[in-house]
Regions:
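N-terminal segments that mediate ammonia production and transfer
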Residues: 1-306
Length: 306
């Protein structure tokens, strides 16, 4: 399991999300509060869209297999960038020499020229049985851009393939439909191959102007009794959000200030503060969509029936 974080709203220094809170994303790499037996030590990645930067439609990109808590470059960058949108990820892998820890496997995934990025918390069990069947559903120009070994990068290519223009800027509804269509394809391939093992697919997908997130799992709770690591996956597919005016210090802690209409939203595997008040748990089998408009943040939660 990994930990994911997405933000959309008022300009906000990255350090407030990665470092400053008492359960920040960097802390979740080595001391996650909702993971008892698993750490996220296989690298960090982020995409950050800053409207004040040169070429604001192109996000700042950073990823490294070093631990983010020891990464001075990341710390300095986080203090300088104040994006209106951020997608970040700390990667967790099984403690095995079969795990491939490499920069090409770090999230968020972003093919050159594409406007959409994707980060994933979860794991498609028995993915090797599905991988080559996915080629039929992924556009050739996208399949040949896959560089890593993860199921997540294939999910990214599959989502892009459902868009009318995988290199264009999708409307929020089109992006949400593409994510749902990708999940339906994955379900069909699993059914065809008799795969019925618990496989979480929590996603954060963004173009920098909108955001789609899912809390979803195929065959939740079904796992081989001899697989102790798989059993520990079950509590880790959490997803939380805080929505309001802007995120900042208030008294002795950090909170999202209330505002109507809202202007900012944070979505994360775990609340960024030990005090969960002000945070809501994303319902299971649901999708969140958010979009920045002139009137504020349009935000919606909907059932995800695929």
């Amino acid at each position: 399991m990994c930990r994911i974080l997405a933000y959309l709203g008022e300009p906000l220094p990255v350090q407030h999300l990665l470092y400053d809170t008492d359960n920040s994303l960097v802390r979740q790499s080595y001391r996650p509060r909702m993971m008892n037996t698993f750490l996220n030590l296989a690298g960090f990645g982020m995409k950050a869209w800053d409207p004040a930067s040169l070429r604001p439609d192109d996000p700042f990109s950073y990823r490294a297999t070093t631990l983010p808590s020891f990464d001075r470059n990341l710390r300095f960058l986080a203090a300088k960038v104040a994006p209106t949108c951020l997608v970040a990820h700390v990667r967790g892998v099984t403690y095995s020499d079969e795990a491939v820890v490499a920069e090409t496997n770090l999230h968020p995934f972003h093919f050159p020229g594409a406007r959409v990025v994707l980060a994933h918390n979860g794991h498609l069990r028995e993915f090797r049985r599905m991988r080559y069947a996915l080629v039929e559903h992924v556009r050739p120009e996208l399949a040949q851009r896959i560089e890593g070994t993860t199921d997540s990068e294939w999910i990214y290519a599959l989502v892009l393939s459902q868009l009318d223009d995988p290199f264009g800027l999708p409307e929020t509804g089109e992006l949400a439909d593409a994510v749902a269509a990708a999940l339906r394809i994955l379900r069909a391939l699993r059914v065809e191959r008799g795969i019925a093992t618990s496989s979480p697919v929590n996603l954060c997908v963004s173009s920098g102007r909108n955001l789609v997130a899912t809390r979803f799992s195929f065959d939740y709770g079904w796992y081989p009794p001899e697989d102790e690591m798989l059993e520990t996956d079950l509590p880790y597919v959490s997803l939380w959000y805080a929505v309001g005016g802007e995120y900042g210090e208030a008294g002795d802690g950090w909170t999202m200030t209330g505002d109507d209409p809202p202007r900012s939203v944070i979505i994360a595997s775990e609340p960024l503060t030990v005090d969960h008040s002000g945070w809501l748990e994303v319902p299971e089998y649901s999708m969140l969509t958010a979009e920045l408009t002139a009137a504020g943040l349009e935000f919606e939660t909907r059932d995800l029936d695929v």
